Amino acid sequence: MAGWPAAEAAGALVVAILAAAAGGAAGKTTIEPCAGADTCAALLGYTLYADMKVSEVAALFGADPRAVLAANALDFASPGAANRILPAGLPLRVPTRCACSDGVRKSVAVRYSARPADTLASVADVVFAGLASADQIRTANGLSAEDPDAPLDAGATLVVPLPCACFNSTDNNLPAVYLSYVVRVGDTVQSIAATHATTVTDISNVNAMGSPIVAPGDILAIPLPACASMFPNSASDYGLLVANGTYALTAGNCVQCSCGPGDLKLYCTPASLTASCSSMQCPNSNLMLGNVTAQSTSGGCNVSSCSYAGLVNGTIATSLSSGLQPTCPGPHQFPPLRATPIAVNQGSYLAPSPAPGAGEAGGDIPGFPGSSNVSPANGPSGSVSQAASVNRPHQIVALILSVALYFQM
């Protein structure tokens, strides 16, 4: 890894060959060996296989809908955010906790409920967009070596292991959060590096690549510059990391933290997304979380600020700091929030510089492209249906004509 001696970096990585598609294509995945029970913040690069609500994407990964929006610098505060529809083909970053399981880093919290016509291959390649392979899902669930295209038992709950990386949450000795990225047709290491504001050398070092060549289905660990927190170990959000140019929600959606664009210093303010939040006033002051006061003097500028110090024992902790600086700071610049996309922009994940509840797995998931995007009323939730849709006018007309011809026979 960049920032480590080259020999140690190469020894710390294991490149595994995994089945990337039912047709037998092979994809390379960077695997980080580990030991212990620690976890880290990580991101999954997911490409929508159909038009989906934000809540449906979140339910698929057991995430909070607003957290998904925040991680992509999409407006997360407006009413009805979870019900917004995202277009098929849209690449998203999904926040996850990267654990240590069976000696390697992976996200093991995702559970998927199979629907009629689901197969291991379709779940791996379509529903989870290549983040997992059919063999990995089979092994994680102790299934027999059956045909990956054989139908699964409807309603069966599957553990879906997903790739992730921690690498001490650093890159070149600077804070970083790692994105698991599935290489798509037409991608090159150069284009991937440009899209994610990193370098070919950095991607090559992190993934122990002998040459900067990738193939569709490969999964790369992409280091993203991030703002690190300095919360005490007792904080429930200890280790919070926010990728540059994005946001994260914490403290039960009471606090929003952002990173960039001017620097890589974490900046947290009240989120105002819930009515039941503990006090956010700094002790022994009139300042609230995120407030900064500045007073110019002959010797410089006296600056006082109230900062977030983590969620400790269910209470929002704050920290007051004061000091003399050479000049007074200007207004804080926040990362720009984008409107919900209605079409796919192939350029990048982010600009430069009653749906399922939050974190509730098992919500309705749209069908495959070309099939119904309406979940069957009586079908198992949280999986894919290939039932035909009759919600488009030309299909309704065809159905009416078929019925009319039937009764004329």
Curated annotation (Swiss-Prot):
Membrane topology: Lipid-anchor; GPI-anchor
GO cellular component terms, semicolon-separated: plasma membrane; side of membrane
Disulphide bridges: C34-C100, C40-C166, C98-C164, C100-C166, C227-C259, C254-C282
Residue span, LysM domain: 110-160, 179-222
UniProt keyword terms in alphabetical order: Cell membrane, Disulfide bond, Glycoprotein, GPI-anchor, Immunity, Innate immunity, Lipoprotein, Membrane, Plant defense, Receptor, Repeat, Signal
Residues making up the signal peptide according to the UniProt record: 1-27
Annotated lipid attachment (GPI-anchor amidated alanine): A387
Protein name: LysM domain-containing GPI-anchored protein LYP6
Organism, scientific name: Oryza sativa subsp. japonica (Rice)
Lineage of the species this protein comes from: Eukaryota, Viridiplantae, Streptophyta, Embryophyta, Tracheophyta
Gene transcribed to yield this protein: LYP6
